[in-house]
Amino acid sequence: IVGGVEAVPNSWPHQAALFIDDMYFCGGSLISPEWILTAAHCMDGAGFVDVVLGAHNIREDEATQVTIQSTDFTVHENYNSFVISNDIAVIRLPVPVTLTAAIATVGLPSTDVGVGTVVTPTGWGLPSDSALGISDVLRQVDVPIMSNADCDAVYGIVTDGNICIDSTGGKGTCNGDSGGPLNYNGLTYGITSFGAAAGCEAGYPDAFTRVTYFLDWIQTQTGITP
């Protein structure tokens, strides 16, 4: 997250940290005690994932943290890495996690938020373009929803399955935030998907997978509904 602030510890208790094949880092959202929602580009081709829940400082072994390894995940069957479409995946935990003050599920929205609504992506991704690694602590930033038309004018690959934010002023998501939630009013409206190659602080829009567009897919895979 660039241009943001450190989150209050455990204030986003659905936020998951994903260590994929001991090589890649992503975020995710706990949508039930046994299911994590994340991005396809995080899980495509993966062998296993260590899911960390209840974390704030990801580089410390906090008492609130629970780590569960999973090899059971489903990437959307029509995920296309070239145009970054259908960028959604779910991970099934082998044992349902015990919910605590620091570990909770997040709801899915049944309707969308309008353009201009201020929403909050969260994650441990790079805190600046010059950062050498992911953030130690969970970070957040408040940003407005922008229209898909304006977003597509920049990228040319934005579809109804996306929702975008205006990152003017260098506020938005960055490498390592992928798969994490776009939070608003206690629900997650998006899955962090892609941004501009020019850099996270360059002010170009950030694109997310639009959760409402994939509600049927999520229900088919997990049985979970809004």
UniProtKB/Swiss-Prot annotation:
SUPFAM superfamilies: Trypsin-like serine proteases. SMART domains: Tryp_SPc. The keyword Disulfide bond applies. It catalyses: Hydrolysis of proteins, with broad specificity for peptide bonds. Native collagen is cleaved about 75% of the length of the molecule from the N-terminus. Low activity on small molecule substrates of both trypsin and chymotrypsin. Disulfide bonds join C26-C42, C151-C164, C174-C200. The keyword Transport does not apply. PROSITE patterns: TRYPSIN_DOM, TRYPSIN_HIS, TRYPSIN_SER. InterPro entries: Peptidase_S1, Peptidase_S1_PA, Peptidase_S1_PA_chymotrypsin, Peptidase_S1A, Trypsin_dom, TRYPSIN_HIS, TRYPSIN_SER. Keywords: Collagen degradation, Disulfide bond, Hydrolase, Protease, Serine protease. GO terms for biological process: collagen catabolic process; proteolysis. Belongs to the peptidase S1 family. This enzyme is a serine protease capable of degrading the native triple helix of collagen. This is Brachyurin. It comes from Leptuca pugilator (Atlantic sand fiddler crab).
